[in-house]
């Protein structure tokens, strides 16, 4: 399954790692470059550094092809 996760906090990171281990195609959008770089080493998937509400960032993560979209940020604006 092609999954996009916005937010690599505790829950988003855990889900990304577990879903990647189960061989799902995982893309994570994270605004914090350091957190994104750490996650990139932990999953077999794509990490996009950027704003999850930006059309350009969503396009870079291939949102049009995703089957499941999980918004797991603490910022709802």
Residue locations for each model-derived region?
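Cytosolic regulatory regions of ion transport systems
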Residues: 1-77
């Amino acid at each position: 399954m092609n999954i996009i996760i916005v937010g690599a906090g505790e829950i988003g990171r855990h889900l990304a790692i577990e879903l990647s281990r189960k061989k799902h195609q995982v893309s994570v959008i994270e605004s914090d470059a350091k957190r994104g770089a750490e996650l990139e080493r932990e999953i077999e998937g794509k990490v996009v550094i950027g704003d999850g509400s930006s059309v350009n960032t969503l396009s870079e993560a291939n949102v049009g092809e995703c089957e499941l979209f999980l918004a797991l940020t603490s910022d709802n604006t």
